[in-house]
Each structure stands twice: as structure tokens, then as C-alpha cells.
Amino acid sequence: MDQDMGMATGYFQDADMQMDEPAAATQSIYPHSATLFAAISACVFVTIGVLGNLITLLALLKSPTIREHATTAFVISLSISDLLFCSFSLPLTAVRFFQESWTFGTTLCKIFPVIFYGNVAVSLLSMVGITLNRYILIACHSRYSQIYKPKFITLQLLFVWAVSFLLLLPPILGIWGEMGLDEATFSCTILKKEGRSIKKTLFVIGFLLPCLVIIVSYSCIYITVLHQKKKIRNHDNFQIAAAKGSSSSGGGSYMTTTCTRKAREDNRLTVMMVTIFLCFLVCFLPLMLANVVDDERNTSYPWLHIIASVMAWASSVINPIIYAASNRNYRVAYYKIFALLKFWGEPLSPMPSRNYHQSKNSKELSGVIRSTPLFHAVQKNSINQMCQTYSV
């Protein structure tokens, strides 16, 4: 009996030692101050990111002016991706950095990198879609309305989301690498399987190649814009000369003003999209390089990996700020949502000016004239022809 109890005691002691061994092996490679900084940053980004992207989605869906642009569909896709990241990936990330371990089980550990890397691909491919939209608007203006019909936009968005997650099928199925827990960094990521990992290939196909497409496209846009500006200057000089020799230049002046306003609006939208891409690049490039170049030697610079990760998380938070800072239409949409939510009073209805009542009558008469079918037919035909010159 005593011998049996001794054997049982020895068995449980051996089991305890075996259970203690992984704990020693999974000791964090990061300083506690670094993990605390990462956890607090993740919590801050969760709060700002969820609110910011939710308000952005509401603002875009409720703004008829913004919904007129085909670009808006890709911006909505980008916002959904950021919202998914802030509401799913970042809360789990905050907990794992606070606890310095992964405590959510094996299944969720395999899902986590799929959502993380899939979101990165969706964001980048959505930007590619925006870039191609801007390029076609300028380079193939006559075919733009045919290419960006609602059904084609839907197909493009389905393609963006499908490709983003299909790229991850090899590690999901364990064919080329596998999804799992890196115990040294308590991170659920793409691990090597049989000495092979798909990380570098994903970096080239899912990050580097889309970035090159965006850079080349915006370079072509810039060159085209320079040529278009020269055309606009020549056209304006012609309009001025025609106005001096004719008293009937009012219609041309109206169309010139309308097209110039549309061109400036498209310009501002393009600049905003370039800003979003540059910020995304600045935020994500350090993490991508750290994961690819320093993948097996990440104990050398632990703080570098933490800072690179925090910068990558910031990319899902800054887009609403860029929208509000760089585009008036987006600011107006945000104001309306805030007013609807009673954050503050309606700021978009200025007091009538001194000449308001005088101008009101003339505007009503102008409105009656412009509401006639003949005016619309002539205006649409003329403006579509002239605006090709002003599509910048």
C-alpha cells in the first residue's frame, strides 16, 4: 500500500514538473513595460477606432452627396475592415499583452491571424480599388460611368474580400505553414511547418505588389493632372477671349464654373485617398519588415516589434481623422451625424444674410427655369462634353 502511494506521489510530482516546463518555456521575451504600453495602446485604439469607424459608416450611408461617388463603396469597405479589426482583433490583443499569454484556446488562436492578416489585405486592396477608380476617372473618363455601375462595384468589392482571405488558405489548411501560437511572443500568427512559412510570399503578393500598383497609378494620375491643368488654362483663356467678343457667354461661364467645381472636388478626394495610403504605408511597413526580416531573431529588438505593432494598430484609427481633416463633404456628413446624435446643435444652417430675401426670389425663378426638361437635356449634354477637359 505504501509502495502504491509512493508511486502515485511520484507520478503526480512528475506531472507537476511537466506542467511547469511549458510555463518556463513561454516566458515573455518582452519587458513588462513594453507589454503594458502595448496593452494600454490597444485599449485606447479600441475605444477611438470603434466609435470613429461606426460614425464614419453612419455618415457615409446617410450622405447622398458622398454616396454619388463610386469611391465611397471602397471607403465603406475600408471602414468595415477597420471596424472589424478594432472590435475583434484589438480587444484580444489588449488582453494577451496584459496577461502576457494567450488564454483564449486553440480554435480562437487559429481564427485570430486569419482576421488580422485578412483585414490588412482588405484594407490594401480597397485602396487599390480606390486608386484604380481615380485613375479611370482621369485616363478613361468617357468609359467611367460604364465601368462603375452599381453591379460592377459590388463585384469588385466581392473580389477584394474573397482574394484577401483566399490568400490565407495554404496556412489555414496546413499546406504551407500553419496558424498557431508563438509561445515566445504569446502571439497567434502564421508559423513554420516543416521548415516552411508563407509569410514572405504573402508580403510580396498581399502587401508589396498592391503598394507598387498604387504608387504607379498615382504617379500616372499626377502626370495626367499636369497635362489637364495645361488644357484647363488654355480653355480658360479661350473662354475669356470669347466672352470679350460675345454677350452670350453666360451658359459657357456657368458650365466652366460647374466643371471647375467638380474638378476641384475630385482633386480633394484624390488627395485624401493619397493621404490615406501614405499613412497606411507608414503605419504598416515597419511591422511587415519586422515580421519578414527579423522573424527568427525578434528577441534582439523587443521594443522595436512592440512599437511596430502599435503603429500598425493605429492605421485602423486614423482614417476617420483624415476624412474629417481633408474633405469638406465628409466634415459636413460628420456634423450631421453628431447633430442627429445630439452631441451638439445643428451647425450647418447659417443665419440669412442681409440680401437673403432679395436673392431668394431670383433663385426661385432660376430654379423654375432649371427644372424644365429642355434645360436638363441641354445642360447634361453640354456639361458632359466640357467636363472631360476638367476631370482632374
UniProtKB/Swiss-Prot annotation:
Q: Which organism is it from?
A: Drosophila melanogaster (Fruit fly)
One record GO biological process? germ cell development
Give the sites modified to Phosphothreonine: 372
Ranked from the top, the taxonomy reads: Eukaryota, Metazoa, Ecdysozoa, Arthropoda, Hexapoda
Keywords carried by this UniProt record: Cell membrane, G-protein coupled receptor, Glycoprotein, Membrane, Phosphoprotein, Receptor, Transducer, Transmembrane, Transmembrane helix
Purpose of the protein? Essential for the first active step of germ cell migration: transepithelial migration of germ cells through the posterior midgut (PMG) epithelium.
Highest taxon of the lineage:
Eukaryota
Cytoplasmic compartment segments = 61-73, 132-156, 224-268, 324-392
Q: Could you tell me which CDD domains the record lists for this protein?
A: 7tmA_GPR84-like
Per UniProt, what is the name of the gene that codes for the protein in this document? Tre1
In its UniProt entry, what is this protein called?
Protein trapped in endoderm-1
SUPFAM superfamilies recorded: Family A G protein-coupled receptor-like (SSF81321)
Membrane topology (Extracellular): 1-39, 95-110, 178-202, 290-302
- GO MF annotations for this entry? G protein-coupled receptor activity
What SMART domains does this protein map onto? 7TM_GPCR_Srsx (SM01381)
